[in-house]
Amino acid sequence: MTTNIVVKLQFEALHNWPGVVNMLPDQPWIHMLKDKHRHIFYITLEKGVTHSDRDVEIILFKQSVVSHLETRFGRPGDLGALSCEMLAEYLLREYNCESAEVLEDNENGA
């Protein structure tokens, strides 16, 4: 049996998609994504544990993720051209997680 801990957090940050005009030239209404814009990123991480007696303390794990994001990207964050997919992949690698979900404004994402 596999057991995971789950943490959920929110991270306010800016990002942009510089390549949107070239990628979607026939969709001018979405070209505004080339400029920095703000989101609340809703992040959910699942991390595997080896036993059920606080192998990884959930509160400390969440605090470490929040602290890392603020140190790496600032507060509010500036993610540059990172997409939800890229941020999810980054967090998967950084924390050796089983899964990562990153949603813009708790609506759409990866």
Predicted regions and their residues:
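Charge-rich, low-complexity N-terminal segments
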Residues: 1-110
